[in-house]
Amino acid sequence: LRIGVIQVPAFYRDFRAESEGSRDFTSTTRDVRRLISELEGKRIDGLVIDLRGNGGGSLTEATSLTGLFIDEGPVVQVKDALGKVEVEVDPDPGVVYSGPLAVLVDRNSASASEIFAGAIQDYGRGIIIGEPTFGKGTVQTLIDLNRYVAGDGEDLGRLRLTMAEFFRVSGGSTQLKGVEPDILLPTAEYLADHGERSLDNPLPWDSIRPARYTKVSLVDMQGLLEGSRERVARDPGFQMLIASERI
């Protein structure tokens, strides 16, 4: 099998260049689209999007990147402090890549990474592999206190305010729980002291009404899970982790 792997370190977009009218501004979606075209020219049998260590970035890019793999529909729901819900929708109807898809995640995959992985999982478009993700399902803004308080020149710092929450199209939040992988890759380290769940007074997990979307269900999840269990059962390293109650 020929498997293409695209590592996505962040969800970036050059908003300044875009606002200045540049036609070739950089963005995650544009770069991934180009790489997919190159990989399909090499006749790949499947594609892996590697989001391990990706702490997030642009919501716009998380939405548009998801759109490369689904035809159309909602990608994520955003609920503000007043309870108003806005649905972010795939901005570009059509599919750039329709073949087998896997998404690699780990404990440091956060925010926009969780939006992308959660949408791919909800649509049944691909399989999520790795560790439970970071669990950051909130939106913050930074307020520069120096702009509002007259001082003697001393830097008063900045205040970070939570202003909204992310919810998957299936209705559940990514807060605290993150995205649970379809196939868990065992780790020798505990996850309880990592991510939002390790912070003092984090916002609790919540859910809202699911958005209207149509599942693609291109994955034989049952067959993949059975194959994974068989490989784990045969692997001495996995069995050692199981015996030590690490997984």
Where are these predicted regions, by residue range?
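Cleft-lining beta-strand/loop regions that shape enzyme active-site pockets
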Residues: 1-150, 165
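Generic structural signal for residues positioned in beta-strands
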Residues: 5, 74, 100, 158-162, ...
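Polar, glycine-rich mid-to-C-terminal structural blocks
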Residues: 124, 129-196
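Conserved functional hotspot residues or short segments at active or partner-binding sites
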Residues: 169-247
